[in-house]
């Protein structure tokens, strides 16, 4: 039990979760496991905090059960009413001393002796990620709240810092031979910050943890649970020095990678400052067999540089809707089982390949639809500041994830292609009207119209995707989607026509062709019929469309 000085994360409520009613609660690590069937999503001050804490819990659970060894053991866990609490508590007793946030010798995720030559302590804005660029004037958080935070919040930001801290100059720790002039020079962001996070969620926290609890026997796409693949609380405490060349030993190692050396200034009554120094540097090239929570992309420049095939994490673009990049996420399209020596554009996240395999083997029902959480951080110049945090959710029926039965995934991919082909058509329509009125090419009118279309399709695509199941008529579903896309164009094109300048109706000659609103509309309708062939019969083409 807690004492006046100890703040042990196994017992103290520090993790923010949503209960079944959607209300926020705080739970300890052991509470989270014990109450997992009745708890929902792990929350936090920022979405990426929940991602980092879930991976911490996964590392703990993997080590507590020393597995799962294979799909059969996983299936037993899935069918049980609760997590294996006896084994969890046995493991907790073994590692308990290492979870004290303010231990004098081995504080959790920190270095007890960490100090600078001048014994400086920085403000909390160094780790509090909802203060943009370290500027308290541009946040709803009050200045007073940055002078002191409670120990529970400090623990959340500590875990987040190791996972997502920006690059840039850090405090120079005494004892780190790489410090120059009292400064620690940039080694890159936290490991999770280099990923395009993909984490499937179930109906409750228990399901979420188990969906992500990849078994040891799938080394073809996730290496986890080997002899040396252990979290920092099972290793000797870190010192101030950091390592630039230690290879990660497996997924558990990466879930808890110590990208920084940290010391919190405070106690269980509150934390007032932090010392943040460089930790273990890690490069992203070819970690696809180690970290299951991101898609991977083939990099031609990196492959040429290293003279071998190189895959890099597929990070999320905040300016592009997640659903439009679904092909990279689906094992049915970008599966890991490819021929020896072959390379492909994308490799799907290992955790989704795992769920697809569980479905293929009958361990997971084909009707199951996890909500796949998509998270990541976009950084600013030289990755030294946060620019934006990406947070989205896609419902993905497990039938979309089967590499051995790719038809449903292919339909989902083709539906995106339908939308993008119509996006090109509506871009051309808007550009033609703008140029007919006298605008220069690529004036921006096309970009705006295309983005309007994608925004209009955002919710319909998610709803359509969620309906793809094992008994779905895929051809019928594709035709229905094409009708949805067709309907979505109408308000956009009507607005473009209504707001067209008078000069656009008269038009002008561009590259020896008269372009005006009427002709642009005919061209668009012809392009629309080519892009959405399942919405009309070929006999519907008009004589004018054939003429142009």
Q: Model-predicted segments: where are they?
A:
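Short Cys/His-rich metal-coordination motifs, predominantly Zn2+-binding knuckles/fingers
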Residues: 150-153, 265
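Short functional micro-motifs and their immediate structural scaffolds
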Residues: 155-158
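Flanking scaffold residues of small Cys/His-coordinated metal-binding clusters
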Residues: 145
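Extended alpha-helical scaffolding segments
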Residues: 1-133, 160, 166, 170-171, ...
């Amino acid at each position: 039990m807690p004492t006046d000085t100890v703040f042990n994360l196994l017992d103290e409520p520090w993790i923010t979760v949503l209960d079944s009613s959607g209300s926020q609660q705080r739970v300890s690590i052991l509470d989270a496991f014990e109450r997992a069937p009745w708890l929902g999503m792990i929350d936090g001050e920022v979405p990426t905090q929940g991602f980092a804490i879930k991976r911490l819990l996964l590392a703990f659970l993997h080590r507590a059960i020393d597995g799962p060894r294979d799909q059969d053991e996983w299936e037993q866990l899935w069918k049980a009413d609760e997590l294996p609490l006896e084994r969890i508590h046995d493991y907790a007793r073994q590692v308990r001393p290492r979870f004290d946030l303010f231990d004098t010798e081995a504080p959790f995720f920190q270095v007890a002796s960490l100090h600078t030559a001048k014994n400086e302590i920085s403000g909390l804005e160094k780790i509090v990620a909802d203060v943009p660029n370290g500027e308290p004037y541009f946040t709803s958080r009050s200045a007073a709240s940055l002078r002191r935070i409670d120990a529970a919040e400090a623990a959340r930001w500590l875990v987040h810092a190791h996972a997502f801290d920006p690059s840039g100059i850090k405090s120079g720790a005494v004892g780190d031979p790489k410090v120059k002039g009292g400064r620690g020079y940039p080694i890159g962001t936290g490991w999770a910050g280099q990923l395009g996070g993909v984490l499937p969620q179930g109906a409750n926290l228990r399901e979420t943890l188990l969906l992500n609890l990849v078994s040891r026997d799938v080394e073809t796409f996730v290496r986890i649970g080997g002899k040396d693949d252990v979290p920092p609380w099972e290793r000797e405490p870190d010192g101030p020095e950091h390592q630039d060349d230690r290879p990660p030993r497996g997924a558990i190692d990466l879930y808890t990678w110590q990208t920084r050396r940290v010391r919190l200034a405070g106690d269980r009554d509150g934390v007032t400052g932090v010392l943040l120094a460089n930790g273990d540097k890690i490069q992203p090239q070819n970690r696809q067999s180690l970290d299951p929570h991101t898609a991977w992309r083939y990099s031609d420049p990196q492959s040429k540089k290293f003279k071998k095939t190189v895959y890099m994490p597929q990070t999320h673009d905040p300016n592009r809707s997640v659903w439009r990049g679904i092909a990279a996420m689906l094992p049915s399209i970008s599966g890991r089982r490819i021929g020896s020596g072959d390379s492909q554009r994308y490799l799907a996240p290992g955790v989704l390949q795992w769920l697809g395999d569980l479905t293929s083997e009958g361990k997971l029902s084909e009707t199951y639809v996890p909500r796949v959480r998509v998270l990541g951080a976009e950084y600013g110049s030289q990755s030294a500041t946060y620019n934006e945090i990406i947070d989205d959710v896609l419902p993905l029926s497990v039938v979309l994830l089967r590499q051995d039965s790719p038809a449903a995934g292919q339909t989902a991919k083709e539906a995106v292609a339908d939308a993008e082909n119509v996006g090109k058509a509506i871009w051309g329509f808007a550009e033609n009207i703008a140029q007919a009125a006298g605008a220069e090419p690529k004036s921006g009118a096309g970009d705006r119209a295309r983005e309007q279309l994608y925004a209009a399709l955002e919710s319909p695509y998610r709803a359509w995707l969620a309906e793809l199941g094992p008994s779905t008529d895929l051809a019928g579903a594709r035709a229905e989607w094409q009708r949805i896309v067709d309907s979505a164009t109408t308000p956009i094109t009507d607005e473009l026509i209504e707001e067209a300048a008078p000069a656009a109706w008269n038009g002008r000659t561009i590259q020896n062709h008269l372009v005006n609103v009427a002709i642009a509309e005919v061209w668009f309708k012809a392009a629309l019929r080519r892009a959405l062939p399942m919405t009309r019969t070929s006999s519907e083409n008009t004589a004018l469309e054939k003429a142009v």
